[in-house]
UniProtKB/Swiss-Prot annotation:
Main localization (coarse): cytoplasm
Binding residues for NAD(+): 72-77, 106-110, 130-131, 143, 152, 170-173
Gene Ontology MF term list: 3-dehydroquinate synthase activity; metal ion binding; nucleotide binding
Protein name per Swiss-Prot or TrEMBL: 3-dehydroquinate synthase
GO cellular component, as recorded: cytoplasm
Pfam families reported in the protein's UniProt record: DHQ_synthase, DHQS_C
GO biological process: amino acid biosynthetic process; aromatic amino acid family biosynthetic process; chorismate biosynthetic process
Family: Belongs to the sugar phosphate cyclases superfamily. Dehydroquinate synthase family.
Gene: aroB
Length: 359
């Protein structure tokens, strides 16, 4: 088992990474002072596969377990679903000595984390991510949120988990589309932060697509190491942490306007990375060769590189609701070659023009 500690003072926590770790969840929670009433929040598809293992482990450690199921899909990561979760937390009798376990992908983790951050002004929660995207990105760092009709993740809080337990064996049950979408976040780390890691992804793309267990565990660990390093220096995204949004500014806007469910999150991020690379090229931060390498690797992993048809006026308007927008200026992440990045201040119109998406 790989153990990685995210050092955030009193908010520090461990990330445990291994295959077949789900049955040990209850013990690891107990070791961290978590016991009593616990709500496991999941969706029907994930619960069918893993809820019984998780429930049995938690019961064995002396917990009273309530399973709360939420609908699958980004379109349900909203206030209506959150209120249904609150209703069930109250009905189950959870109090400030209780905790929440988020069992699932990014939607479950984001919503369950925000429920934990706000229920009774905050109760502990544990992340048990079962998708590649959640394992390498959304489960680590304490970003919790729900969506608003005007944009993605506009209502949320920074709220760190007590523990992240990653069982890489859960990746074997992922639909191929979800697995490939998670690879967009993996590629993001290489482009924005680590050239050697990017080269490993190019070199081992075949093994990755074959879902080689050792290869996947190394990839998940490296992504978590890179994210933890940034979060430790900038927990609440006041500066450095913005680099983790590479590909996300345009990606989020495209995902919102295409309609949740049209593109899964990782597919939108892949398109956002291609557009970010074009903007970086136009700004002189990278070469044509760098852009070609990024497009090639995304294509090798079966990810889209061309945005759907979207009204550019609405796209510009949506960009201005982005959390990184200040007085009409967007803090945009450009890649500097491959393996490094830089923050550039641009207007929405400049972003669309430089990316080739004319207003």
């Amino acid at each position: 088992m790989s153990v990685l500690t995210v050092n955030l003072g009193e908010n520090s926590y461990d990330i445990l990474i291994d295959g077949g770790t789900l049955p040990s969840l209850g013990r690891h929670c107990l070791e961290r002072g978590l016991s009593g009433r616990v709500a496991v929040i999941s969706n029907p598809a994930v619960a069918e596969l893993y809820a019984e293992q998780v429930r049995a482990s938690l019961v064995e450690s002396g917990n009273q377990v309530t399973l709360i199921l939420i609908p699958e899909g980004e379109e349900h990561k909203n206030a209506a679903t959150l209120n249904l979760v609150y209703d069930q937390l109250i009905q189950a009798g959870l109090d400030r000595n209780s905790y929440i376990v988020a069992l699932g992908g990014g939607v479950v983790g984001d919503l369950a984390g925000f429920a934990a951050a706000t229920f009774l002004r905050g109760i502990p929660f544990v992340q048990v991510p079962t998708t590649l995207l959640a394992q390498v990105d959304s489960s680590v760092g304490g970003k919790t949120a729900i969506d608003h009709p005007r944009g993605k993740n506009l209502i949320g809080a920074f709220y760190q988990p007590r523990l992240v337990l990653i069982d890489v064996e859960t990746l074997t049950t992922l639909p191929q589309r979800e697995f490939r979408a998670g690879l967009a976040e993996v590629i993001k780390y290489g482009v924005a932060m680590d050239l050697a890691f990017y080269e490993l992804l190019e070199r081992d793309s075949g093994r990755i697509l074959e879902m080689d267990a050792d290869c996947l565990e190394r990839i998940v660990l490296r992504c978590c190491e890179l994210k933890a390093r940034v979060v430790e220096q900038d927990e609440k995204e006041s500066g450095l942490r913005a680099i983790l949004n590479y590909g996300h500014t345009l990606g989020h806007a495209i995902e919102t306007l295409a309609g949740y469910g049209t593109l899964v999150h990782g597919e939108a991020v892949a398109i956002g990375m291609v557009l970010a690379a074009r903007i970086s090229l136009a700004g002189g931060y990278c070469s044509e060769g760098d852009v070609s390498r990024i497009v090639a690797l995304l294509g090798r992993f079966g990810l889209p590189c061309i945005p759907p048809r979207i009204d550019q006026g609405r796209l510009a308007e949506t960009l201005l609701t982005d959390k990184k927008s200040r007085s009409g200026i967007i803090r945009f992440i450009c890649n500097r070659g491959i393996g490094d990045c830089v923050v550039v201040n641009l207007t929405a119109e400049q972003l669309l023009t430089l990316s080739g998406l004319e207003v």
